[in-house]
């Protein structure tokens, strides 16, 4: 018997059943327990959501930016008031430790919504004189109805990252959460309605890609798609969106990010950063610094520091506040990670720790993989080239700065990069040469609301967060005004 009642679709400010009557199970990855049966949206449900969104968007866009901001700020207050309950639901659905979801997932999502509620009023056009009797002005107008497809690792945070700029700019959004972790997106829809968002302005359609995801990207009345997920799926989404109606797209995709530890680095600081860049959220973070480059002479000292820190990881029940490392999100994903680990062993990487599924006691019921560190890695190894999206750190050695940068850039990805050094001149020199959209110096992982985030190369298109993203949810209208009598040549 599932823990929760059937989860319906959220269309037009209320819960409705899927028209096709199909459902899918959502599982707690720490225990294998079925949490709920969730209704699977289809094309007919999408059409209903689009109709609802179009009606709601007209009402929403007619409000002043001040009025829209007040409603969004009420939603922020409700999110913060319900932080603990939402965090617990997120932990049940994702397997992430409660210590994480309480302090990061809802908190940072609410921060982004608050940011856009504040800057929405700064979305202004320009007035430019052309000559004595003529000028033009520009308007930033909402796109209309936009679609978004979320990932399973940060469900409510990603939903808010996508909804906040879209709604602040006057759009309506149809959001498809990952079918693996859809529960908190539905709660977010409730909160928006309670805060005063007009019906239809934020609809949630759980379901798989075949049943609703493709239909969302192809729908002719959806003006933009924002997608977070893997690069292979991103290519399909982009092709579908462009071939159907030339939709605009924003994509935050995969990564295989480098972390360069410089010869003058504080090795304790570098080890702390490497641990967070690989094992936070059990390694299920797109920006993870999974390729750690360390000077050859410092390899053994650095290995020792990493191994000492692995011993401090508290693996266990995600609902236990002492736990700092939980299961992977699903059995299928666990199997994929384990296959990559076996590939690393077969290709000659030296296993320092981990490398297996954890099955002691209650852990056997969940999808736990031990924190894994490989050393003696080479650039051609599969574990170094491919995104694993799990707790697998690959340690590589280098001899000089130019070599480190060249090898760090030798990837089709370009999402993130980091440098550890006390020398700021060196830090800037290296960062400016690294081909990545998000870079950190002597830190890792923070993405505050005002900071645009997104990738180079095959790690993404466009940006999330920051003022530029608000503008990306608008289209610019240019209007010329002639004050003198128009002179025709005919």
UniProtKB/Swiss-Prot annotation:
GO terms for biological process: glycine betaine biosynthetic process from choline. NAD(+) binds at residues 150-152, 176-179, 230-233, 254, 286, 387. K(+) 1 binds at residues 93, 180. The keyword NAD applies. K(+) 2 binds at residues 246, 457, 460. Binds 2 potassium ions per subunit. Belongs to the aldehyde dehydrogenase family. Dimer of dimers. This is Betaine aldehyde dehydrogenase. It comes from Xanthomonas euvesicatoria pv. vesicatoria (strain 85-10). The gene is betB.
């Amino acid at each position: 018997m599932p823990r929760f009642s059937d989860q319906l679709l959220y269309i037009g400010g209320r819960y409705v059943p899927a028209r096709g009557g199909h459902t899918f199970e959502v599982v707690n990855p720490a225990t294998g327990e079925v949490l709920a049966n969730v209704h699977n949206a289809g094309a007919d449900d999408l059409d209903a959501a689009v109709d609802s969104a179009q009606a709601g968007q007209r009402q929403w866009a007619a409000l002043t930016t001040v009025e829209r901001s007040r409603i969004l700020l009420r939603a922020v207050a409700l999110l913060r008031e319900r932080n603990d309950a939402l965090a617990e639901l997120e932990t049940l659905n994702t397997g992430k430790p409660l210590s994480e979801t309480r302090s990061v997932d809802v908190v940072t999502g609410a921060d982004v919504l608050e940011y856009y509620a504040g800057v929405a009023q700064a979305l202004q056009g320009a007035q430019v004189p052309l000559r004595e009797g003529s000028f033009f002005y520009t308007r930033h107008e909402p796109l209309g109805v936009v679609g978004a497809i979320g990932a399973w690792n940060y469900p409510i945070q990603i939903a808010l990252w996508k909804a906040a700029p879209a709604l602040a700019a006057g759009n309506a959004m149809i959001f498809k959460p990952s079918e693996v972790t859809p529960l908190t997106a539905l709660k977010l829809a409730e909160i928006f309605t309670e805060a005063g968002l007009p019906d239809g302005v934020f609809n949630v359609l759980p379901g798989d890609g075949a049943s609703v995801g493709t239909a969302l990207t192809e729908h002719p009345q959806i003006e933009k798609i924002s997608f977070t997920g893997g690069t292979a799926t991103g290519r399909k989404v982009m092709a579908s969106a462009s071939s159907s109606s030339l939709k605009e797209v924003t994509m935050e995709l995969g990564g295989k990010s480098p972390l360069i530890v410089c010869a003058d680095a504080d090795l304790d600081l570098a080890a702390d950063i490497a641990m967070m860049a690989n094992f936070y959220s059990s390694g299920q973070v797109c920006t993870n610094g999974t390729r750690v480059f360390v000077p050859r002479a410092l390899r053994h000292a650095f290995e020792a520091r990493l191994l000492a820190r692995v011993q401090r990881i508290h693996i266990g029940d995600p609902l236990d506040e002492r736990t700092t490392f939980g299961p992977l999100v699903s059995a299928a994903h666990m199997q994929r990670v384990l296959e990559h680990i076996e590939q690393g062993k077969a290709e000659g990487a030296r296993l320092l720790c981990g490398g297996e599924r954890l099955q002691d006691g209650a852990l056997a019921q969940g999808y736990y993989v031990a924190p894994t560190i490989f050393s003696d890695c080479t650039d051609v190894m599969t574990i170094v080239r491919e995104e694993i999206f799990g707790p697998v750190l690959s340690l590589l050695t280098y001899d000089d700065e130019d070599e480190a940068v060249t090898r760090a850039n030798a990837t089709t990805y370009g999402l993130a990069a980091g440098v550890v050094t006390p020398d700021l001149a060196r830090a800037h020199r290296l960062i400016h040469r690294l081909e990545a959209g998000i870079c950190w110096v002597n830190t890792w992982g923070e993405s505050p609301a005002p900071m645009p985030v997104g990738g180079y190369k095959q790690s993404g298109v466009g940006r999330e967060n920051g003022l530029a993203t608000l503008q990306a949810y608008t289209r610019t209208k240019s209007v010329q005004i002639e004050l003198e009598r128009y002179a025709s040549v005919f």
